[in-house]
Amino acid sequence: MKKIFLLFIIFALGSCVAPQQNPNFEKNVELTKAWFENWENEDLDYLSSKIGESIEWQGAFYANKEYFTTKEDVVAYISGWLAAMEDINYEPENFLPGVDPETSLPNGSVRTYGTWTGVNTASGKPFEVKFYHYLTFDDNGMLVNGGDYGDATGVVMAVAPDPES
């Protein structure tokens, strides 16, 4: 009985080991914070300079089934948002570690949930919407994978200029 109890204790203690954090996670959180700060500053040059030549980006618009796979396409996607909105602000709720989809181990990527606010440039209508984002950086701090999840189409429709009667 003592041996069974001892084995149980050893098993219980062994299963309490916390998973190891990827050593790049904290650095990538800082890169992510800078990414969103420059969205708020509408600094397309900075944002463009942080996108890798090899990229996969999932946009958030309705029927957007394909990843953007070129830097130019991702920059055009961002540019469209920046042209349509002003006074942009992202208020993150958190920055969470991402995992490799094949191994389920922390891979240094960053996930964040937060609230975007701003004003539509054409209509002057304000918006407030929750989004989820994921960003993966390479060893040089370049964005190589990312995406947005939220109701982008709904936001655009909600703040569009009113039709003229």
List each model region and its residues.
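Short, low-complexity N-terminal intrinsically disordered segments enriched in polar/charged residues
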Residues: 16-45, 49, 164-165
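Short beta-strand segments enriched in hydrophobic/aromatic residues
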Residues: 51, 59, 114-118, 133, ...
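Low-complexity, intrinsically disordered terminal/linker segments enriched in charged
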Residues: 142-165
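Sec-dependent N-terminal signal peptides
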Residues: 4-13
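Hydrophobic pocket/interface hotspot
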Residues: 35, 46-48, 55, 74, ...
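Exposed beta-sheet edge and beta->alpha loop/turn motif
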Residues: 107-140
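Short beta-strand micro-motifs enriched in acidic
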Residues: 98-102, 136-142
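A solvent-exposed, acidic/Ser-Thr-rich amphipathic alpha-helical stretch
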Residues: 45-108
